[in-house]
Amino acid sequence: MFASVLKKIVGTKNDRELKKYSLIQREINALESSIAALSDEQLKEKTPYFKEKLHTGASLDDILPEAFAVVREVARRTVNMRPFDVQLIGGMVLHEGKIAEMKTGEGKTLVATMPMYLNALEGKGAHLVTVNDYLASRDAEWMSPIYSFLGLSVGVIVHGMDDDERRAAYACDITYGTNNEFGFDYLRDNMKYSLEDYTQREFNYSIVDEVDSILIDEARTPLIISGPSEESTDKYYRINQIIPRLKKERDYTIDEKSRTVVLTEEGVARVESYLNVSNLYEPRNIDTLHHVNQALKAHTLFKRDVDYLVKDGQVIIVDEFTGRIMPGRRYSDGLHQALEAKEKVKIEQENQTLASITFQNFFRMYSKLAGMTGTADTEAAEFKKIYNLDVVVVPTNMPMIRVDHTDVIYKTEKEKFSAVIEEIKELHKAKRPVLVGTISIEKSELLSKYLTQTGIQHHVLNAKNHEKEAEIVSQAGQPGQVTISTNMAGRGTDIKLGERVAELGGLHILGTERHESRRIDNQLRGRSGRQGDMGSSRFYLSLEDDLLRIFGAEKISSIMDKIGIEENQPIEHKLISRAIENAQKRVEGQNFDIRKHLLEYDDVMNRQRQVIYEQRRNVLKGDELREDLLDMIEEVVEDFVPEYVDEKRHPDEWNLKGLEDRVLKQFSLRLDFSKSGDVGSLEDIQEKIVAAVNDLLNRKEAEFGKPLMDYLIRMISIQSIDSHWKDHLLAMDHLKEGIGLRGYGQKDPVREYQKEGYDLFMDMIRRIKEDTLEKLCMVQIRREEEVEEMREQSRQNYIMNRGEDIAAPATVRRKNEKVGRNDPCPCGSGKKYKKCCGANK
């Protein structure tokens, strides 16, 4: 009560933000007449003038009013569009690194030009991120006259470009592109063998269009670059054959709320019998159990034409939020292969991850991040918690006059669709356009069948005919048009009204089901009532809809009983609408928890990724190549010598023969400790080995020449890093798969993942060093004839020794890993140990 009274007196936080921006907006308006009086040449001179001001100490905020006024005037002269006052406010929100919620049709594309221009003046680049190549190319083409007039270069990143084209686009002052392209370029750059081949520069400033789609809906989908694994695909066919023989409840149970399926004890026994396995939970059968679970998921939780479609012999994922197909994307962990087996199409090999990153961690690398969308306020808490982004709701330029009717609810889906058809008939008779929203391809085709039976002409827009999207959407606001669409029509499209449609009441939005997220429903509604147009919306629901059936049926049924609703009678009641909204909030909260939980795990991988990528870049720079190599030799020697030389024991008990063998294997050096009498102390032995390795590498440098030796050090180091990083990613995946079970032992799975992940990481760092030095010490330059002789000898040896496995003895490792001088400092500073806590050691 007190809070609501206080809000009325001092206003909401959003009101206070808007008041602050309004003061600056008035400053910009005051400059308009003087800026308009400038010639084209004088306007063009403003860019070098602003850059000079920044160079002499002015901040971006200092020059904002004049810079925005300049962009407004240039927009009027070049693209014949003058930003409204609310668009100036939207631009200020974006400049401050916040999210601007602006309704459909409010001109977000134009809004972005002002903060993009301002932030590009620093010369560090500014990125505008969109959801697809079409929008990236379109927006860059629309707005480039403004930037070009002001002397700034514009680049576009789209799929299919080569590295030279990408490098040129990233070098521009302003770069448009998609989230996928920006993310994959980052991963690809960090797999390259030369800094000159990198395409991207620093991550300075970014505006993410449709920010809720990219940073929330896509947050659970990592970008992955993968290579083929060598596993056979036969197991997927074999396991797929047994799944139809299992029965629900008897052999497995489904939890639709958490989208999980679990085998019962009877089901486990039946699977063991079908697969001729004695114990499915034995360590050697864990892989089989995993693939059985994935096959169960594929058959019970994933529906064709809802979650995916089959096209040209391929299983293609359908994005649940946008309704669009996602060619090239595949489910991981064998799930996609299980779906391919289920649909009897060719099974592609499962891939091994070579590099990956989530959008959450990619976009957090930008010095300043901003976003814009028509629907963000419902997720404001998540934006703040995960990305530290505030949401500011920007008012519309014209008052919103769309009428949003309360939901109408029926007991069965059949009754609901009958009512939907009747309403469409009435609207069609009145020549009023209607956009019907469905949540899946399956439902859009079902409704289309009903409309065809009644003789109503209509268009269907879903992932199966996405190529006709522009044509269908352009006609959707014409008199008498009936358009059925999945979530595809919910974003990035403006539906313009035909002649006299406004007099009929504008475009009517008819939703046939509530989505799990209120944002998706709001996006559908937002297709109508743009820029002060007339319009209306209504949702038709049934208790058989997934959302209500899984999350709200009991509560809503009890409300219906209290109200006294009979069969076939529709319900319109605020209590019901509130119960539905509460169900959506519960699902949103659940999904937020899942994303937050995934981020906690990914943050561990992210810190490791940053260290590895920094090490790669340092090797490629080569600034301290020889110093780092000497440190590496010392660290490897100091790591393994104590395994053979224990100073607590008498020298006669030292394993000097084992040490000689280890030095020979590690460095290709024959050193004789056992016959040299007094071998000295542990430190003496270490110094002797380090000196010998150094001498060997110096001889190689004298033979090869310094340029070739430096090249070999770089290439061998990078190959070792990449090879072991790939294996480490797989090990971390396996660790994450089983870590959840630690909760049953009263341990925090995330803490355990952090601890064991760190141990795996430090072990990988050790192996990278050993591998690099082993290869460097072995490398030789051979004549072509010698190489051919060696190849032939290798072939002969393979034929002679085929089938023989020689087990290498396991090396005993000390329990606590020693921190190497080049390793990341355990204190968490991000610096090398030798330049942090180890500086004085």
Swiss-Prot record:
GO annotation terms (biological process): intracellular protein transmembrane transport; protein import; protein targeting; protein transport by the Sec complex
The EC number(s) attached to this protein equal 7.4.2.8
Disulphide bonds annotated for this chain are none
GO CC annotation: cell envelope Sec protein transport complex; cytosol; plasma membrane
User: What PROSITE patterns has UniProt attached to this entry?
Assistant: SECA, SECA_MOTOR_DEAD
Cofactor(s) it depends on: Zn(2+)
Entry keyword set: ATP-binding, Cell inner membrane, Cell membrane, Cytoplasm, Membrane, Metal-binding, Nucleotide-binding, Protein transport, Translocase, Translocation, Transport, Zinc
Q: Does the keyword Mitochondrion apply?
A: no
Residues reported to bind ATP: 87, 105-109, 494
**A Pfam family this protein belongs to?**
SEC-C
Instruction: Cite the SMART domains for this sequence.
Output: SecA_DEAD, SecA_PP_bind
Q: Name one GO molecular function term.
A: metal ion binding
- Entry keyword annotation includes S-adenosyl-L-methionine: no
Subunit info here reads:
Monomer and homodimer. Part of the essential Sec protein translocation apparatus which comprises SecA, SecYEG and auxiliary proteins SecDF-YajC and YidC.
Q: What function is annotated for this protein?
A: Part of the Sec protein translocase complex. Interacts with the SecYEG preprotein conducting channel. Has a central role in coupling the hydrolysis of ATP to the transfer of proteins into and across the cell membrane, serving as an ATP-driven molecular motor driving the stepwise translocation of polypeptide chains across the membrane.
Q: What family, per the record?
A: Belongs to the SecA family.
The entry's protein name is Protein translocase subunit SecA
Q: Which organism is it from?
A: Syntrophus aciditrophicus (strain SB)
Its gene is secA
